[in-house]
Amino acid sequence: GEHFDYGGNPEDTVSEIRRISPDDVAGYQRLLEHSKRLFDIGFTKLSARPFDSFLLMLKQVPTLLRLKAYRTVWQFVSAHLKHDKLRRAFSIQPLLVGGNPFDTTSIYSLIHFLEYSFGVFFAKGGTGAIVDALVGLMERHGVRLMMGQTVSSLHIENGAAVGVHLEDGNYIKADMIVSNADAPYLFTSMLPDVKLPLMTRAKLAQAHYSMGLFVLYFGTKRTYDEVAHHTIIMGESYQELLTDIFHRKVLNDDVSLYLHRPTATDTSFAPPGCDSFYVLCPVPNLKADIDWQQEGEKLQNQIIATLGRTVLPGLEETIVSNFFMTPADFKDDYRSMFGAGFSIAPLFRQSAWFRFHN
């Protein structure tokens, strides 16, 4: 199949666009400039600061209208690029935060410029190394950490959270509670005796949730040195697949995949002569009628076959270990509402000030 090497800077990207569709070079340069303007408003003046007041967001509305932020990401990209596969490649950013490019506001096209501005980094040792470093930092400052405990509910007195109830029956009193739990789950399951404000109840009733994720982790007894750290494998269908995931909520015979090969950057992720991967497949969340106990292994086999036909030849014979997670695991392990991979979807009416407040 065709390939597109995204590159690490605009010059590399332009070179690839020129190879595939020379007529789209000028359009891409306009897209990049528009993405920068969206970044200056959508990130610098909106996302990078707290939303304590609706007026703060309201002040940016005229500029957002001038930038045509009412368009979807797909409409934004299609206005600049004509080649269908380039349109697909440059409209996938909303999927990085759980959104459908055909529904998500083009504000999120700022991600393209953001990646060039800040870069894309990987911590040696992976996310686990970041967690270990944070644990060490907190312990050095006298913070007591409790591992393997699950908070079942918050204890509220006079409108304030004053403690937490654990699943093992213990109670911990607190002067202040900071929670990074999935907000919809917290409001619906961890405040059993609290009547929520009307606005919060309305948000919950009308909330649209992000897609689910099927994540397959596997190791191989050989290396695939030609495979980069990040690879996206696009299926034959695009809009139809996304419609099945986000609206029809059914599994499609086609799949699009994100393949992560950390050993391309950090060889400690696998023994010598071996490789380590995970592959992420967008799927419907648990609002769908899907039995993941039955469908999980089928999808795993489909993904392995797809990778074997494309970027990892001979994969079926080289896998030495593997396991997968489904939206059901996200619900059970991470208390994510409907097993959504990214909580509520990044629609305009659920972004910035419209999100759940602190």
Regions found by a protein language model. Name each.
Residues 83-97, 254-258, 313-358:
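A glycine-rich dinucleotide-binding beta-alpha-beta segment and adjacent secondary-structure elements
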Residues 104-115, 272-274, 282-283:
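Residues forming anionic-ligand binding surfaces in small-molecule and nucleic-acid pockets
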Residues 68, 78, 110-170, 175:
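Helical element adjacent to the flavin cofactor pocket in flavoenzyme catalytic cores
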Residues 2-103:
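Rossmann-like flavin
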